[in-house]
Amino acid sequence: EEELAKAQQALNDAEPLASGGSDEGVVNGFYAAFHAAQAALYDRGIEPSSHGAIRNRFGEALVLDGSVDRSQGRLLTTLADLRQQVDYGYEPIDADVATLLDRTRSFVESMAALVDSEPGE
């Protein structure tokens, strides 16, 4: 539940940044997806130790077993790559931040539904 709350807060923080034209909305969008993915993994008893491990374990534990669609795994990877570009790149990103945040909101909702629908812990 704590990770899902963090995901929701990151989404809430991302929206004004994106509507103001800031690429920083992507960073918050990544953290929203990151925390939601982490919640789904924790629910399955998986405790990854890094951002990269979360992406890998998400693919192994949730995408490959069919619990989530491959497009959700790709979104997590896309957001991670864009976050790196925003944080460390010198050029603006070439992405529609509003659309990414819409997809991220759906991702967070899907992970919350997954956590609520399956017994965990």
Regions found by a protein language model. Give the residues of each.
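Terminal alpha-helical segments
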Residues: E1-E121
